[in-house]
Structure formats: structure tokens, C-alpha cells
Amino acid sequence: MGSAKSAMLILLVAMVIASCATAIDMSVVSYDDNNRLHSVFDAEASLIFESWMVKHGKVYGSVAEKERRLTIFEDNLRFINNRNAENLSYRLGLTGFADLSLHEYKEVCHGADPRPPRNHVFMTSSDRYKTSADDVLPKSVDWRNEGAVTEVKDQGHCRSCWAFSTVGAVEGLNKIVTGELVTLSEQDLINCNKENNGCGGGKLETAYEFIMKNGGLGTDNDYPYKAVNGVCDGRLKENNKNVMIDGYENLPANDESALMKAVAHQPVTAVIDSSSREFQLYESGVFDGSCGTNLNHGVVVVGYGTENGRDYWLVKNSRGITWGEAGYMKMARNIANPRGLCGIAMRASYPLKNSFSTDKSSIA
């Protein structure tokens, strides 16, 4: 009898482990006929959490902190499964933010200041990409296919999205104009662009102005990313090729057609509202979920297209490759709101570069 009970216990444990193995894709746990989680949820969630910790290199300072994170993780896991059961055009998953509450996620990720700079020294408004009846634009654009997009980067716990979005647009334009894709330095902006606040956040327009006034941007190899505020060291740019721009312009506000035309010509920076739980846990598909227009996060729009009949913007984030579709989001395009989903058409801008140019001077 004892051996039979032991065998039964082993069988039950094996069933739990097997069910967890199918859930290790970090996206879904099975439901019963009433869409209620099975009674094994807690056991599965704990094992999934351990695997998730390994995948994302998570280590907590105490048992109490780990238990607190597990509680948040379980709540996010339930939310993911409930939303994914609704057969949406996108799916949620256990991103690197799955152990954070929504409030904590906002504190970590939002670094774009939507307020206009007090002194637009170089900024000009432009109708360069205003659409007309004669325009014939490609049905889809993906600047990755043209070699104009560097690898997805991760800003870490530094609120430096403003730097990553600016740098991404400059990297793309530099490739288009010069034929050379150069990975540029966000740390250069964080340390040296004193009119912004480094890991405390910043304005994209101010970053463009800094690049113009201070001899361009250094490369990531010369000035690598540290994810913390540092002292500006001009020597890191001395005698090295720095990528320059000639100016920048803002797109007409609340005009997705103008944004589309601009993206057909070059990658474009945009400030969006990324403060929803769905955005925090986005995994794949065309996102048309909950978000407002409280602009707080800088991204790069590197293309557009249509998937399963749904138009989308191809957005490069700076949260590493474990968020979204290997670091990218397909965000619904051509929605009823002229501001665009998450305000993507409200505050878009792009750099200008007329020719190949470098500067070997340092900055103070």
C-alpha cells in the first residue's frame, strides 16, 4: 500500500512538472471549461517563477523580497492568462517586468519629458513630410531590412529612453546617408548633455540640439553604456570619428499620414504613453490595447506594415530582446484617434543630415 501511495505521489509531481514544461514559453497556463485556473496554478506559478528568474538573471536580496516578487509575478501571470483568453490581436507574456507592479514599472521605464524645450535653438517646424494627393508610399517599410537599424539595446534601470530614441534615429539616418551603420553612444548624451537629466529623464529635442552643438555623437565602443549618470569625459571622443547631424524637425502633430511618409524615408523618434499593464507585458502581435496620451516614453519608429489585415507601426524599444517581439512592438496604425495609439503621432521628430561629416574635437 505504501509503495502504491509513493507511486501515486510521484505521478502527481510528474504531472505538475510536465504541465509546467508546456508553460515555460512564458505566455499561457491552461484553463478549465469555465476559464478558471486549475488548482495546480500555485505550484505551476512557483516553478515558472524560478525558471523566469534564471532566464532574466534575477536575484533578490532576501527571502521576504523574493516572496513579495512572487506574489506580484503570480498576479501578472493571472492577468496575462485572462487577457490572452480573450482572443486579441496581440499576446501578453512574462517579460522582464513581470515581477514589477504597474507603479514600479512606471517608475523604472518612463524617462521622456513631453514638455517643449524652453529654447528651441535649432528646431524648425516643417511640412517636409506633409502628405498630398500625389504621394505614392510603399505599403510596408522595415528599415531593419535595409541595414539601417542597430541591435536592440537595453536601457536597464536608467530612465534614458530619451537618449536611446534619439540615438536610434541618428544611427538610421547616418546609415541611409553614408552607407555605414555605426552603433552610437547613449552614454555620451547621458553624461554630457547637461540640459537633460541623464537617468532622470530628458527631452528628445534637447538631445538633438546637443549633438549639433557639441561635435556629434561618439560611438558605443569609444563611450560604452553604463546605465548610470557619469562625468562627461571629452577625451573618449578625441581623435575618434563622431557622427554628426545638420538639424532636426518636428512632424506636424496628430497626423499619422505625415508620420507614415516620414518613416518611408527614415527612422523617426516618437514619444508615447507606455504606462499600461498591457504595454508592460506585451509579447507579440499587433497591439491595440489600453493606453492613453500621457506621453512619457521615447521610442524609434523603424517601419510600418499590415499583419492579418491590421495596420501597424514597427516600433523599436530600448528594453532588451526579452520584451515584445525580440525588442520590437507592432503598434496599431490608422486608428480613429488622430493622435494615434498611445499618442504616437503627437510628438514625432527626425534628424537631418545632408552629407557624410565627422568631427574629431572633444567636448568640455
Swiss-Prot record:
Tissue specificity annotation: Expressed in inflorescences.
A GO BP entry: proteolysis
Residues of the active site: 161, 297, 317
InterPro entries: Papain-like_cys_pep_sf, Pept_his_AS, Peptidase_C1A, Peptidase_C1A_C, Peptidase_C1A_papain-like, Prot_inhib_I29
UniProt EC number: 3.4.22.-
Keyword Nucleus tagged: no
Signal peptide: 1-23
Positions annotated as propeptide: 24-136
Class in the EC hierarchy, top level: hydrolase
Residues bearing carbohydrate: 87
GO molecular function: cysteine-type peptidase activity
Domain of life of the source: Eukaryota
Keywords for the protein's UniProt record, in alphabetical order: Disulfide bond, Glycoprotein, Hydrolase, Protease, Signal, Thiol protease, Zymogen
Disulphide bridges, residue numbers: 158-199, 192-232, 291-342
A Pfam family matched in the record: Peptidase_C1
Family (UniProt): Belongs to the peptidase C1 family.
Known role: Probable thiol protease.
Record-given protein name: Probable cysteine protease RDL4
Lineage of the organism: Eukaryota, Viridiplantae, Streptophyta, Embryophyta, Tracheophyta
Gene from which this protein is expressed: RDL4
